[in-house]
Swiss-Prot record:
Keywords: Glycoprotein, Host cytoplasm, Host nucleus, Secreted, Signal, Virulence. A motif (RxLR-dEER) lies at residues 41-55. Induction: Expression is up-regulated during the late plant infection stages. This is Secreted RxLR effector protein RXLR-C12. The keyword Secreted applies. It is found in: Secreted; Host cytoplasm; Host nucleus. Residues 1-18 form the signal peptide. It comes from the Eukaryota. It comes from Plasmopara halstedii. Secreted effector that suppresses pattern-triggered immunity (PTI) in plant host. Glycans are attached at residue 155. The RxLR-dEER motif acts to carry the protein into the host cell cytoplasm through binding to cell surface phosphatidylinositol-3-phosphate. Belongs to the RxLR effector family. GO terms for cellular component: extracellular region; host cell cytoplasm; host cell nucleus.
Length: 173
């Protein structure tokens, strides 16, 4: 009877060791190629064929693809936080240009225009930039705000030149 119980336990232990729990990944397990292979196998048992990389042999997977697969299946919060950061970045881009400083964003060529006027004030063609500002419904006060971060003694006269030229451009339209 004792031999039967010992044999039964040995067979049971062998079955448990060769067929690990498909739902559980040990938190303290070492990261190794065997652990990676086992993780991918477990992921494949849950959702087979949802991502093209999952159908590839494990040794052909790039590490970035492996991280993406694991992050999207094992830790969905990572994927969610990434999408949330993309949404917040899109919201920041869609804010009104009037609220953004010229250092944050070169608003429709304002800084390029200032550099051009500094180098060749008489020959600089400002109408393309003025056309963009006109389409954005910028008034002369808004145009002045574009240059607030670049205002100093050296640039002040050039900025006044640009603002005055823009006022004249708006009157002509």
């Amino acid at each position: 009877m004792l031999q039967f119980a010992t044999a039964f336990l040995a067979i049971s232990a062998n079955v448990v060791m060769t067929q690990p729990n498909q739902e559980y990944i040990a938190p303290g397990a070492r990261v190794s190629s065997n652990y990676r292979d086992m993780t991918i196998r477990r992921l494949r048992t849950h959702e087979i064929g949802t991502v093209p990389e999952e159908r590839m042999p494990i040794h052909e997977l790039e590490i970035e693809d492996l991280i993406t697969i694991i992050a999207s299946k094992v830790v969905p919060e990572l994927s969610h936080s990434e999408s949330m950061s993309l949404l917040s970045a899109e919201a920041a881009r869609s804010r009104s240009f009037k609220d953004m400083a010229a250092d944050e964003l070169d608003v429709d060529g304002a800084l390029d225009l200032l550099k051009a006027v500094q180098s060749k004030p008489e020959t600089t063609d400002m109408t393309p930039t003025f056309g963009v500002w006109e389409e954005s419904n910028f008034d002369s006060a808004t145009v002045e705000k574009l240059f607030d971060s670049k205002k100093n003694d050296e640039n002040e006269s050039h900025i006044k030149t640009i603002v005055e030229a823009y006022k004249k451009f708006r009157k002509e339209k």
